[in-house]
Amino acid sequence: MATWEELRQECLNCRKCSLCQTRTNVVFGVGKEDAEVMFIGEGPGQQEDLKGEPFVGRSGQLLDKLMATVDLFRDKNIYIANTVKCRPPQNRDPLPEEQEACSAWLDNQIALMHPKIIVCVGRISAQRYISKDFRVTKEHGLFYDRDGILYMGTFHPAALLRNPNQKPAAFEDFIALRDKINEICDHTY
């Protein structure tokens, strides 16, 4: 298996799908590479594409606030990645073939990290990692064991910005996440 740096360098040169033709930057991921908690979003937006880092726009600011309420910080104790590493045009959902082209990158990140908990941020990542029929509005905040990793789906911050009345439910998801972290994680959170 490649090291983090080898994987990052290979990913930066990826040409596996057409998203490489319109990207400004590959958005590989950010955070502690040995974190026990990983967040997986859908795909980079415009700000993420420009900066090369996941969740840096308005959605990222809201995600940071939600995480901070339960003492999670991207530079301290979590890792954040996306289902696809390049921005889909017009911020559309990543197509299944684009997700498949990127799947080895994310699967290798997960294998290198060995997280205990993965938070699927939004429908796309939850349908990829929890269940193809996953419905965020019905199943958010619940934990699913997949090969020894606990997965939880929650609302994408962009959805919360469009529909603020879902913020209390998202906050409850993060409380459940904090409780699960305290139950099963070894690192100090």
Predicted regions and their residues:
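A polyanion-binding, active-site-adjacent surface
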Residues: M1-Y189
